[in-house]
């Protein structure tokens, strides 16, 4: 009898222990905490029907490209009907841009992406609509329109921000970004309900979340913005508990931290600048100290924050162009942010070294599948200025070169998937006398990783306390190890497991 009682108690203890360990090992951790995102401009990516405009079926055909690169989630830039090429002036929130395909194509994309364990989030642009959206057309037509209060109107032109008010026969309307993108009036409860309805529609189609365009501009008041996003996020979680929202709050770290009161994730613009400028100056400008400070700051407002890290996006000069065409510096910048905790967002073409600068169209040029640009999937909706036929910037040339940006990214992402410390570990700077050496360690449970970069164009030496064994080296580029010493070549990176 005593033996049976002992066995029973032991089994109960084991069950409780296993349950506890399963919990603390992140079994219930949100999927996005370990995601690797790829931002894709559908128009420029892959054409399936020969009209030279990228489309959803082209994306479907290229899902294995993402899978092979270890991409686990896609952010689709706007895919709704719109007037402009970029899609940020929406005319219908419940349909697909006809140049991109049909709703059936979209549903097929969601299904096939999910079959390959690739999540999809949409760019949700709700700060404003197109001036040709039926809501605004009606709103501008009459004082008595049921949609009049969907937008912000004034009978007279206000003195404050007068350049942001535009005239119609029925009054002046407010448009922050452009006259043809009038701002919605979120003080109107009907507008807030419309936005929830839109999001619900796409979640029911199978999307996994949204990138929130212009998240800090919904109201001209941060506290009201935060309250709205809190309300919106709470509503979506009631429909889809694991929904992912990431805000575009293009501001300093203090402002971004405030928005963590309402959102689970925000893009880390200041960190991006810190990394890019450090590589450009060949000197660590305090990347890790800054990141540690930010993470503490973000955690004060949201203990479960998910930091969205990146180098550049669709509004900024491309990475390689920023570095004057330098492949080594482009690889180094990628090596840094892809070995930091957070959720990395890769801008399409970054991984093959595409170039581009303002105006915006030329930051969003066609993805080059082959150097001659004759692939059947090649888009050509705009004549490129930077990524021209025969200039060597293309996937096929990158794949063949073992030292290419593409193969470097592929290897780094493979390591990131295997080593969870890189995504979610506690990070700590390893002090060095020379600021051209950036060294840090990441720790998660029993996994410890050390990363060392040489930001300089000249050789450097890094001394470590313990001997570095070959079996513990996860990645080494342009460097070599000698017992407890690393000889770092120009713009080199070493990733190693440590005791």
Swiss-Prot record:
<keyword id="KW-0119">Carbohydrate metabolism</keyword>
<dbReference type="InterPro" id="IPR013780">
    <property type="entry name" value="Glyco_hydro_b"/>
</dbReference>
<keyword id="KW-0479">Metal-binding</keyword>
<feature type="active site" description="Nucleophile">
    <location>
        <position position="213"/>
    </location>
</feature>
<dbReference type="GO" id="GO:0009313">
    <property type="term" value="P:oligosaccharide catabolic process"/>
</dbReference>
<comment type="subunit">
    <text>Monomer.</text>
</comment>
<dbReference type="InterPro" id="IPR006047">
    <property type="entry name" value="Glyco_hydro_13_cat_dom"/>
</dbReference>
<feature type="binding site">
    <location>
        <position position="217"/>
    </location>
    <ligand>
        <name>Ca(2+)</name>
    </ligand>
</feature>
<keyword id="KW-0106">Calcium</keyword>
<dbReference type="Pfam" id="PF00128">
    <property type="entry name" value="Alpha-amylase"/>
</dbReference>
<feature type="binding site">
    <location>
        <position position="127"/>
    </location>
    <ligand>
        <name>Ca(2+)</name>
    </ligand>
</feature>
<keyword id="KW-0963">Cytoplasm</keyword>
<dbReference type="InterPro" id="IPR017853">
    <property type="entry name" value="Glycoside_hydrolase_SF"/>
</dbReference>
<comment type="similarity">
    <text>Belongs to the glycosyl hydrolase 13 family.</text>
</comment>
<feature type="site" description="Transition state stabilizer">
    <location>
        <position position="315"/>
    </location>
</feature>
<dbReference type="InterPro" id="IPR056300">
    <property type="entry name" value="SusG-like_C"/>
</dbReference>
<dbReference type="InterPro" id="IPR006046">
    <property type="entry name" value="Alpha_amylase"/>
</dbReference>
<feature type="binding site">
    <location>
        <position position="183"/>
    </location>
    <ligand>
        <name>Ca(2+)</name>
    </ligand>
</feature>
<feature type="active site" description="Proton donor">
    <location>
        <position position="248"/>
    </location>
</feature>
<dbReference type="GO" id="GO:0005737">
    <property type="term" value="C:cytoplasm"/>
</dbReference>
<dbReference type="InterPro" id="IPR045857">
    <property type="entry name" value="O16G_dom_2"/>
</dbReference>
<dbReference type="GO" id="GO:0046872">
    <property type="term" value="F:metal ion binding"/>
</dbReference>
<keyword id="KW-0326">Glycosidase</keyword>
<dbReference type="Pfam" id="PF23915">
    <property type="entry name" value="SusG_C"/>
</dbReference>
<protein>
    <recommendedName>
        <fullName>Alpha-amylase 3</fullName>
        <ecNumber>3.2.1.1</ecNumber>
    </recommendedName>
</protein>
<keyword id="KW-0378">Hydrolase</keyword>
<dbReference type="GO" id="GO:0004556">
    <property type="term" value="F:alpha-amylase activity"/>
</dbReference>
